[in-house]
Amino acid sequence: GATLGSALVYTVGGMLLLVVRKPAPISEYPRKYLLVGGVMFVLYEAFISLAIGLASTSVQSLEVSLVNYLWPTLLVLMTAAFSHKKGAVWRALPGAVIATIGVSLAVGGEDFDVNVALQNIVSNPLPYLMAFAGAFIWAIYATVTPSMSNGYDGTTVFFCCVAVTLWIIHFVSGQGLPVQAPSVWGFVAVFTCALSIAGGYACWGYGMLHGNMETLALGSYATPILSTTSGTVLLGVALGAPFWVGVILVVAGSLITVWIDKRATKHTA
């Protein structure tokens, strides 16, 4: 099941992070950061896992993933809003819209149909609502928690909390452990997924605390592109024209945002 797979991946990932990025003693973390950041981190992961699990078809799973990938756009806009620069949101909006269209093309490809998507949302709205809520929560998390952290990175702690939450959801939903033990390749798949996801979150957490948030927000558009690329390579599927058009739009949207912002900065200097 979806929850079992996610729980296994996050359990292994949490163990890896405990070894590689051992957290500071809990008592040293700011309480507000632990509470607000921890709740948002766990809610995001729980919402996304449940949203994908509640999707009734493969098409709905794709559409739910697209809704989830609104988080880079929301992050760009929120970062602009919290930058306290006059008109920053309006300057970020054109590039954000172009990049979002690019993400939709790159991830959805030729299989994405707006009319079908609207029908699916009406017939099964919960996974779409959860995916959008998750995207919104993650954008808020990335925007507001660095200022609460006092330099502490709670990624490892939050990741382990997600693993516990997913196990609770799995057993409460009436699902038990599998009757048959996974194959060797099953264990390899879990470990590989855990390594990539935990590594990605570790890098993201470090970037939030030590990098430029505006640059990180723009760079986040690469996440769905890289995810789609790796998936198609693993499945041996050729990348079609919509993907490459989408990539061009993502790059163009990001460059437009940078150009408009630099132009505005020159005029105000």
Where would I find each of the regions flagged by the language model?
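Juxtamembrane helix-entry segments on the extracytoplasmic side of multipass membrane proteins
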Residues: 1-7, 26-31, 108-135, 172-191, ...
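Specific alpha-helical transmembrane segments that line the substrate/conduction pathway
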Residues: 4-14, 53-86, 213-232
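Hydrophobic/small/kink-forming positions within alpha-helical transmembrane segments
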Residues: 11, 18, 38-42, 46, ...
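Specific transmembrane alpha-helical segments of multi-pass solute transporters/efflux pumps
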Residues: 23-62, 67, 105, 193-211
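Hydrophobic transmembrane alpha-helices of multi-pass small-molecule transport proteins
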Residues: 11-12, 17, 36, 41, ...
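Loop-to-transmembrane alpha-helix entry segments
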Residues: 27-32, 62-68, 83-105, 125-127, ...
